[in-house]
């Protein structure tokens, strides 16, 4: 785990149940981008869920900017006990010209070579949402504050078998 998170547990995908759920989603994603895995229309036989884990993030904990290995990665937010609107009102965040407290954020290089950020503000509306993205895309999770409940997320990496 790249993060500064105290509790993270490895999960097992028994009988490839989770991979079978993810495969059509990944196929749609890759087909939309017109990415060909092989000469076949379906990529079902080419995917493997390499790693699967759950993070229990407490206030002040964070995941610094990092990427993953493989083809695709994902995060599913299971519990988000904070609201970004309140988090962005914390004095040190409010006084910032770019508050990111509690956000999930991608970092990428745009078409003219400038490094850009894309933040996804976190609140309970994101519970149950899955975000699928290329594994090499750099991302980070900012800490949240003033909340004793845990933020719970499930993440994983998909590779070509």
Question: What positions do the PLM features span?
Answer:
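Catalytic core of non-heme Fe(II) oxygenases with the double-stranded beta-helix
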Residues: 53-132, 142, 149-150
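Non-heme Fe(II)/2-oxoglutarate
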Residues: 1-46, 51-63, 100
């Amino acid at each position: 785990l790249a993060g500064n998170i105290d509790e993270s547990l490895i999960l097992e995908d028994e009988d490839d149940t989770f991979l079978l759920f993810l495969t059509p989603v990944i196929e749609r994603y890759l087909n939309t981008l017109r990415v060909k895995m092989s000469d076949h229309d379906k990529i079902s036989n080419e995917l493997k869920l390499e790693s699967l884990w759950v993070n229990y993030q407490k206030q002040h904990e964070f995941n610094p900017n990092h990427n993953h290995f493989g083809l695709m990665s994902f995060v599913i937010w299971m519990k988000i006990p904070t609201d970004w609107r309140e988090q962005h009102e914390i004095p040190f965040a409010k006084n910032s010209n770019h508050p990111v407290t509690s956000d999930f954020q991608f970092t990428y290089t745009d078409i003219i070579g400038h490094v850009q950020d894309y933040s996804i503000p976190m609140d309970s509306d994101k519970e149950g949402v899955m975000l699928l993205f290329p594994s090499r895309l750099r991302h980070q999770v900012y800490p949240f504050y003033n909340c004793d409940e845990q933020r719970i997320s499930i993440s994983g990496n998909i590779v070509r078998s």
